[in-house]
Amino acid sequence: MLEVSVAAILLLQINFAVFAAIFLFCLCRSFNLNIILVGFTYLLPLVPWWLGSAQVERILIVSYCNLIFGIVEIVFFTLTERQEDVKFNKAYLQQLFGHVLPIIAALIGMSFVSRTTLIPVDIWELIIIAILFTFGTALRVLAISQLGFLRFKFNIAFRDKQTLKTDQLHKYMRHPTYTGMMFVILAYAVTTHSWYAGIIGTFFAFFGFQYRIHFEEQALKEQFGKDYENYRAKTPMWLPFLN
């Protein structure tokens, strides 16, 4: 296996520099632990060092996936995050260890497994990764855009004038933002070219989302009462028609 080419290293360095610059800008705008966690989740797999004899195409796929999705995530969280939402209490720590850290472990872990995989990327693998990643990213962006800045946030918190969302994508599934990200997680899993790493990473992410959903739906029930119970009874959690 040949060393990673100079051109590939240059692309990796550009991706790293672009995301690092956006990360720093977001930190200047909203400096808090949530933004730091999101930023480092996608920055670490972008490091253009310690590549050795690696599979160039696979490393570049990992780099661009983390660059594109990382920008989406950190920009949305920076735009929607408010200082009053970040409260270091029991509920925050529950979400940190039960929801956030398992997903971070999945994303970083599968990214680094992919970076060390020596098997070349074939055309069908590339097509599957592209479809899963593009669909998942588009679904998440659309779902967040439809939710709006009041409803989408890192922590489980409710703001003044916030209403229950039951139309558009939320008419067909209760958590389209999480569904979108799970498709992206599946793209990361395929990129590893390892059944073990892919299944373990996907399990960690799925556990993290289910943990979040458990507490989020409890909070929604307390906030909106019967309206949420009726919505939950008729609307699937993850995918349309799978209630």
Task: Name each region found by the language model.
Residues 177, 226-227:
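Cytosolic histidine kinase catalytic core of two-component systems
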Residues 154-178:
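Active-site-proximal inter-transmembrane loops
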Residues 1-158, 188-219, 223, 229-243:
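Membrane-anchoring alpha-helices and their flanking helix-loop junctions
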Residues 105, 177-180:
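Extended hydrophobic secondary-structure segments
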